[in-house]
């Protein structure tokens, strides 16, 4: 489908409207595949082209890597073709598969679609999408505010003076992971030992990812429970990672993922995630007297002001973000 779309675009400069049904005669094995899964692939492909036509900067749709792309497919619930019962999941053109259910499904929820994915470690996951009533609470009056500033070490610092204390899971496991990756590089590609070692490396990465997500879920839950509004900087994390060569550190603490978790947890409770403009000089302004320094290098970890204020620069920035967040809230309210 993509090859035909590319060819048609090169000739006509338009998107070809082709469907999976038109290829089943030429490729009979497509009849063995769930037709709704093929339809979802078609929708994803058309969406990629529409986005390209709207925003050429995103790039022309291209072929996905066979080795490194995410292995998944999505199917839809139509006329009871998907069944979830007694710890078994029945998908179209498949026998019922025993599953470990993450949580019980409330009554009244309607199953809409299922996305099945395979992790590099060989584990399979099914993400179930349900249609339900709006679970978001009504917005409440914010009384308890918290300022939060991004930090390379510990993930973030709060206006209370506390640090998140993120354990840097990837950094701690880096030596062990490097040793296992060296073993993998010495194995003959495609051999049984290569596959075993590849799975072992994938399990290390999966463990690090799960540790990170567990820490972030617990912290974001705690903040969403304790505060009515959390004020953060709207940072360009990709720019920081590339421009300041902090890529590995930022990817390790997963600050962007943490903000996403915190955002939806606050929204579910009718609370607020207030984003302060990224160009707001939170680090240069004194949180006590309001004086703004002309220059402040990254090596200066203590903020010193002529008024006598002596404070950790990250805590000082978090207090300034808190004040600016309160101002934005009052203005919008």
Task: Label every PLM stretch briefly.
Residues 1-333:
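Nucleic-acid substrate recognition interfaces
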